[in-house]
């Protein structure tokens, strides 16, 4: 089965209480991640497992999976049902709770932008637990995503704050692990390349992904939301012509043999 087949087979099996809307929003990211991994049954460490959909996809694809998360207890029943041990770890403050060279791959998807400190120590930890030849597969929102840039330009022209006041007050009240709910900063591809190299890995694949542009332009939504689909399709065509404006960065770092 292809990465697409595996992801879509999982999507068809999601029960109503299994966050189907989350899957709809993230399915294209899941496909890109799965396609970038070494073949199963490689041993994979997933960093930031909640809500567990990609964890389940990895198991469906026959990978041996371990995970770390800030709140492993919140989905403990799911981890047991999948046969996956998920340990607590705060990457800003702690080393990964594993010995050297344990994993064939590390998945670090949509997490780096939430770290409050420099991500370099965490990336060096990921390099440490990889076996020689192992891969770090990382995705994060693109700082140069054209939709975000246009929104910022509109805010400037209209004299609006970049962050609505109610969002500001919510952010200011976050404390402890809750502070990681927000994005601390976004990255460019050049910055990610530098971070990967400084962590001791070699950059393999480095690609601008359109995971978010594809959401909402599925054929089944055209009759229900024609104007919205047309607008999103236009954005997708624009970023297809200018890949550096796409929504997602995907980079693979490989540990030297």
Report each predicted region and the residues it spans.
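A short SAM/SAH-binding and catalytic strip from SAM-dependent methyltransferases
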Residues: 107-117
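Conserved SAM-binding motif I beta-strand of class I
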Residues: 64-69
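Conserved alpha-helix/loop element of class I SAM-dependent methyltransferases that forms part
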Residues: 24-41
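S-adenosyl-L-methionine-dependent methyltransferase catalytic module, highlighting the catalytic core
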Residues: 3-28, 53, 70, 74, ...
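Conserved class I S-adenosyl-L-methionine
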Residues: 41-50
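A structural alpha-helix within SAM-dependent methyltransferase catalytic domains
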Residues: 34, 59, 123-127
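Conserved SAM-binding loop of SAM-dependent methyltransferases across substrates and taxa
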Residues: 51-61
């Amino acid at each position: 089965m292809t990465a697409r087949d595996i992801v879509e087979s999982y999507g068809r099996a999601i029960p109503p209480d299994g966050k189907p809307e989350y899957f709809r929003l993230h399915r294209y990211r899941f496909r890109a991640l799965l396609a970038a991994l070494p073949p199963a049954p490689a041993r994979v460490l997933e960093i930031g497992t909640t809500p567990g959909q990609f964890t389940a996809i990895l198991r469906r694809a026959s990978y041996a999976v371990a995970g770390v998360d800030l709140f492993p207890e919140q989905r403990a029943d799911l981890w047991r049902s999948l046969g996956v041990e998920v340990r607590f770890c705060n990457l800003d403050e702690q080393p990964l709770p594993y010995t050297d060279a344990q994993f064939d791959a590390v998945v670090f998807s949509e997490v780096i932008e939430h770290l409050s400190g420099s991500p370099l120590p965490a990336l060096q930890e990921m390099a440490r637990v990889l076996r020689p030849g192992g891969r770090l597969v990382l995705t994060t929102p693109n700082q140069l995503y054209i939709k975000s840039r246009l929104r910022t330009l509109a805010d400037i022209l209209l004299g609006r704050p970049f962050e609505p006041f109610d969002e500001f007050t919510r952010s200011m009240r976050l404390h402890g692990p809750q502070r990681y709910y927000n994005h601390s900063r976004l990255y460019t591809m050049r910055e990610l390349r530098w971070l990967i190299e400084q962590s001791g890995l070699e950059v393999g694949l480095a690609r601008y992904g359109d995971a978010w542009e594809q959401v909402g332009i599925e054929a089944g939504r055209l009759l229900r939301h024609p104007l919205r689909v047309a607008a999103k399709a236009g954005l997708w065509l624009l970023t297809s012509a200018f890949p550096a404006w796409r929504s997602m960065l995907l980079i693979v770092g490989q540990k030297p043999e």
